[in-house]
Amino acid sequence: MLIGEHLVPELGHENQVGVQCEDAVPTSTNLLILSHEPKYDGLVQLRYSFRLYPTAGQRISLARAFGCARTVFNDALRIRRDAHQAGQPWPKTGELSKQLITEAKRTPERAWLGEVSSVVLQQALRDLDTAYRNFFDSLSGKRKGPIIQEPRFKSRKDHRQTVRFTANARWSLTEGGKLRLPKIGDVPVRWSRVLPSTPSTVTVVKDAAGRYFASFVVETEPGEVMPRATAEVGIDLGLTHFAILSDGTKIRSPRFLRRAGKKLKREQRRLSRKAKGSNNRTKARIKVARAHARVCDARREFHHQLSTKLIRDNQAIAVEDLCAKGLARTRLAKSVYDAGWSAFVNMLEYKAARYGRTFVKIGRFEPTSQVCSQCGVKDGPKPLHVREWECKACGAVLDRDINAAVNVARAAGLAVSACRARVRPGPVPAQCEEAGTHSKASRTSGSQAGIALL
């Protein structure tokens, strides 16, 4: 979810959907914007993440905070599950807070909960409330997408650990640029820009590769509308070429996972040979996680650079609503996941909303590959190995991908043309009723005379 500042410095590093904080590729900064949510008062909520470099003692304190928050979360989940199975009333958050935090600190078994900020423990209960709310909303249909699973117990072996500090925790930023966290200390931060406003919360994240991030939530005014552009573009997403534009431009797929496959296999083999539970296995697991993180970072960098360039150059953008999950059940699964279409489309969507561009997503059942972009005649489905085809109605020779991109734009109502597209109009054959001698003299059209349609 990074975008190189060497390409588009004024737009910054933005991403809407990812929740996993990743480090940058070597040539980039460490800033990410993970989400933006418009509010009713006109403010926009942004999330900025920066890399943290805690000391050895601070890593121990953070591990203690992760463990305490995990314990409170699991205890609350267990109480609610037991109450549900026994047919008892639903335990409220206030009751759980009193029982699992306030009273538990006074017992010898849970006295160590007092070693961390109480705000961290309170936020663990709120996280459980959010998980249950999302679960019930997915069952009732209020939440879009597939039904999500019921909240599960957290494990100390989970690859991703988080704790959140709100304003009540009285965390702050020091004059030296460090992040001061209660009962943890001043943690060094690698800053890449100044925050646009005072953050309301900060979440400390430890990922599978052992890296630490500070994720700040700020509220600010919507981004400035970019200068109006004249171009409009339709995009057809693919595998050999990641994106094909309606103007004929083809952008090859970098295939980051395929390129890193040899190193990933080597690290996976080394991991499989380590004894379970040993320190060497832990080290090998971290190496595998770091290799995967580099692939994710490179892919995210590519998505950000391309999406920002498209937003800057075009006033309106149209894409097809692809079913990535359906394609992932085919032999193309690895390539589909390597492309990361959904993340790229989400970047286009939120950047268009933020910078005053028009974004249109057409239905996935639109026959973009079956309709001739020159005459509009539907020619029927074609196998994937057919990359060029000739329209039987007008004789135009069409590039499959560019033709689909033009149809995507037209289905979205955009006025685009296939500039530089491989379209070779041919003579239209005369119909049966036109093949004989006309009994009456009349003006002959270009199509009737076999003249190429332009």
Question: What are these model-derived regions, one by one?
Answer:
Residues 2-454:
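Nucleic-acid substrate recognition interfaces
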